[in-house]
Amino acid sequence: MTQTLDTREDPLNLGGGGGGGCGCGWAHSASLSSWSSCHRRRPGAPAYNRPHRYSPKTEYGPPRKQPKQQHGPGFWFQPPVCSNWGCWGGPWRPPPPGFWKFPCPVQVFRVYGLHPLCFCCCSCWSGSWNPGWVKPPGRKKRWGRRGRGLRHHPRHSYPRSPPADVSTLPRPVKLYEWREPGMRAPPNTTQFIMNQIYEDMRQQEKVERQQEALRAQKATVSGEASPARSSGNDAPPGGSKETWGLQETLYGFVQNPSLAFSPNPEENQSLAPLLVEEEEEKKNDDEEEYDQEVCDAKEASEEEEEVEDEEEEVEDEEEEEVEEAEYVEEGEEELEEEELEEEEEVLEENEQRGEEFHLPLEMPLSIFVEAEEKRENFISCTFLNPEQIIPKVPQESLFMAQDFNC
């Protein structure tokens, strides 16, 4: 007869696991314990090394004693079915509209735990009966538990971009001034480049003209010096004049190679004034062209001004005509208004006179009708005589009043 030593399964030690008071003294081969949903340790297994089939952290420790509360798809809090609170239980709700009093302008502001329909200042600010308005319980932060979720919870949903380099950004545009190295070219870049090229060509032409003028001056000076030499040395030393001239030319070529293809001094003398005259003619032509352009521009501007003056005069005349027409229309309207006002005044005066002038009852009303017909023939009835319109009835019968007191 074997008795179990587990007092939890057999607290009275009656022999036999969970036998209770049945009187069975023999122990069962497997302990008959009540079934439970929570995990229980087998009797022979160690505390920290039990075989958990589906647990990812088998080596760290035992599983949770109670299953973790999982928030399902529905509401995470259901109010109690029945309670002792009666009508004072549940969330705060405003009183019926008959009890509302607003001593001051209502201020609506949000406080944690405040029911969205509560506008008063009372004890319900500390918290509401319905925990549905409170945030569901979150996970408590612990040290060294980063591996549960994201390693670094990002403050921004996008990665921060590095600050932009200001030196690489485009600079503003200068159209009509000297461009700095960092400045952008103007939008019409091709025109700008062509203008620069033409300006360079003009500068080059000017420099070439100056060089030609200097060469002409040098040629004239050398031409003046050569006849003085020939007059001083009448008898050339050895040889004829031709050989002496050849030697001079060769010596001149060796000394100044730029004169190798230069014309004779006489030609130079004749060419120098020609060049000067050509330059003067060119200058005069340029000045004349410039003066002509200026005159043309002035004439064009004067013509434009004349055309504008004529247009302005035409516009002024049209405006004056329109103003005159408007003035005439306004005068006609004023005359019509004055006539209407006079007619209204006459009618009002007639009405007032009629009200003030009390006619006797015996006086017939045909007088006014005849007067109106004479003044303005309102009624033009050819098929009705005035006797038919206003029949002659004895006046006594008109103003007869029956005696009702009889």
From Swiss-Prot:
One of its GO terms (biological process) is spermatogenesis. Residues 138-158 have a biased composition (Basic residues). Residues 278-294, 301-349 have a biased composition (Acidic residues). The keyword Nucleus applies. GO terms for cellular component: nucleus. Residues 203-212 have a biased composition (Basic and acidic residues). Its main location: nucleus. It is found in: Nucleus. Residues 43-72, 138-167, 203-244, 278-358 are annotated as: Disordered. Residues 199-225, 274-359 form a coiled coil. Keywords: Coiled coil, Differentiation, Nucleus, Spermatogenesis. Regulator of histone epigenetic modifications and chromatin compaction into the sperm head, required for histone-to-protamine (HTP) transition. HTP is a key event in which somatic histones are first replaced by testis-specific histone variants, then transition proteins (TNPs) are incorporated into the spermatid nucleus, and finally protamines (PRMs) replace the TNPs to promote chromatin condensation. This is Coiled-coil domain-containing glutamate-rich protein 1. It comes from Homo sapiens. The gene is CCER1.
